[in-house]
């Protein structure tokens, strides 16, 4: 018998084929692992609400809805021209103004021209103001000149009131000094009375 020859006692094993039930088992094991990790996280960081969606992701700051009125501008922060156009359309809708035909557009322009600062409008406004001044009407405008400045306001330079606290306690030195001064004053008054009596001067009590 040739030693190099090899005799197979058993047939070779069949090739491994991934069956569908094995794939489902692997996916189920992955979901079980994820759920177990989530329950561990919930146990560490406190209870999670039952009605909260696990796939919920918080929105970024400043990405709120609205026409550029969020914290950082929103989605329409740079598009101010379109926002102004939309605001103008909404204004017209609220005022029930329709400018669909050329006649309506022309009428709307003529109506707006009445308030334009032309020379005739300025002249008529000045005449109305003069008439109101002659009638003695008070000026209720909110201009800068009509309002007093902080330096002209009467309470601008008013000193704040000092808070009343408990009386200060006198030290022993001040008490002794006060008693000594009182005694010296009494002695001086007695000396002046005796001196005036000796000189023949009458001392009348002050009424």
Curated annotation (Swiss-Prot):
Q: What is its main location?
A: nucleus
Q: Which GO terms are recorded in the biological process aspect for this UniProt protein?
A: box C/D snoRNP assembly; cytosolic large ribosomal subunit assembly
Q: Where in the cell is it found?
A: Nucleus, Nucleolus
Q: Where are stretches of biased composition, namely Basic and acidic residues? A: 156-165
User: Carries keyword tRNA processing?
Assistant: no
A Pfam match is: NUFIP1
UniProt entry keywords in alphabetical sequence: Nucleus
Annotated Polar residues bias: 21-40, 140-152
**Keyword match Nucleus:** yes
State where composition is biased (Basic residues). 58-70
InterPro entries in alphabetical order: NUFIP1_cons_dom
Q: Where is this region: Disordered?
A: 1-81, 140-169
The Gene Ontology CC terms held by the record are: nucleolus; nucleus
Q: What is this protein called?
A: Uncharacterized protein C16C6.03c
Q: Which organism is it from?
A: Schizosaccharomyces pombe (strain 972 / ATCC 24843) (Fission yeast)
